Amino acid sequence: MKLIIQKFGGTSVATNENRNLAVEKIINAKEQGFFPVVVVSAIGRKGEPYATDTLIQYANRMGKKVSPRDMDLLISCGETISAVIMASELNARGVDAVALTGEQAGIITDNNYGDASVLRVETNKVYRHIERDRVPVITGFQGVTEYGDVTTLGRGGSDITAAVLGQALNAHQVEIYTDVDGVMTADPRIINSAKVIRSVDYEEIFQMADSGAKVIHPRAVEIAMKSDLPIVIKNTFSDSPGTIITRFKKDDETLAMGDRGLLTGIAYLHNRAQVVIDYTGGNGEDSGDDILDKLAEMGISIDLINIFTDKKVFTVDGEDCERVARLLEERKAKFSIKKDCSKVTVIGNRIRGVPGVMARILRALNRNNIKVYQTADSHATISVLVKTEDAKNAVIVLHDEFKL
C-alpha cells in the first residue's frame, strides 16, 4: 500500500461541513489503495477562537512579555485542538484514527522558538500506528526539542510538517488541501481570468512562493525537491485535479501544455522599502560591506540588491525600516528610505537565456504609467519594485502582456 501525506489548511478544517469534505478526501484516498497520514492546521483564520493569530493576540493582551518558549507552547494549541477534532470525525465515520502532537509523531527540532528547523523525524512513532491500520492525524506547525520543549516551525509551518513527514516516511506524494483549485497564474483576487497551472517545476514554485504566492511554504518545496517528493496542491471544496509539483526538464511534455506561455506565473510582495546608501564624497564610518554584514547579524533580510560605485540600493521588509534607519544613523551614513513599495515578480524557467524579456516588461509598465524604481533578475525570475498603489495594476498589465 502506498503511503501519502494529506495536509488540510485552516479553512479546510474550520467548520463541520468543511471537515466532512476533508474526511471524504481521506476516505477516498483509502478506497484508491493509499494509506493516508493526515496533517492539520489550526482551525480557521484570524479572529476565530483557535486560529494562531487569535492565540497570539491573547498573549499580547496580557500586557506582559511572554517568552518565546512559552509563546510556542501557547500558539501550538490550535493545531492540537484541530487534530483531536479531525481524528474524532474520522472515527465517527468508521476510520480508525489517532491524534498525535508533533512530539508524539517524533518531529525533533532545534530550539529556535517561533521558527524552528526540523532535525529529524523518529518515524517509528508514526509507523506503529500505520502497522495497526490506524490513520495518524498529526498536528502541523509544531515539533519538540531534544529536551521536550514544544516548538513551532514559523508561519505556514504545517506545509513544512507535511513535507518532512513525506520525506521521512518515503511517501508516494504530499497533497496540500486549500480553498483554491491549485497554483494560479496570478492572484485570482486581482486577475479574474487567472488559470490553474496543472504542472510546475520545484524551482518555479519555490520562486513563486518566495515572491509572495501563498499557496505553499517555500521551505516545504525545498524539502520536497531534495528527495524528488511530488507535491499536489488540491481544493478541499472541489474535485479539480489541482497542480502537481515535480522535477521536469525543459523538453518534457508537461512544458508543452497549451495554457502556459513564456512565463509560469506572477507573484507580488507588499510592504517593501527601498534603501539607498549614497557614497558620493565618502559616507561616515561605513566600509561598504560592513553595513550589509551588520544587517545580516541583526536578522534583517535584504533583497533586490544593486551595488554601484557611488551607492548601494536594496530592499527590506517594511517592518525593518526603523532598525535599518537607526543603524545607518549610528554609522553617520547618507541614506534615503522609500516606503510603501511592492515587489512584483514574473516567474518561468523558460525565460532563461531569452533576450528582451526585461525590456518587454519595462515597456508594458511604462505604457501604463507605472514607475519602476528598481529591477532584478535571475535565471528564472524578473522582479520590479513599484509603489504599492501601482502593484495591482502592474500584475494586471503583465498578466495580459504575456497572455498567461
What is each residue range found by the language model?
Residues M1-V221, V386-K387:
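Nucleotide/pyrophosphate-binding catalytic subdomain
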Residues I43-G44, V180-G182, L229-I231, N235-S240, ...:
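Glycine-rich beta-alpha junction loops
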Residues T243-L404:
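A conserved regulatory-domain signal marking ACT and ACT-like small-molecule sensing domains
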Residues F34, V95, L229, I300, ...:
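Short phosphate-binding/catalytic loops that engage adenosine nucleotides
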Residues Q173-Y177, I231-I233, D303:
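Short hydrophobic alpha-helical runs that function as membrane-insertion/retention elements
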Residues A224:
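Acidic-aromatic/histidine active-site loop/patch
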Residues S41-G44, Y50-I56, I233-E253, T309:
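Terminal amphipathic helices with adjacent charged low-complexity linkers/tails
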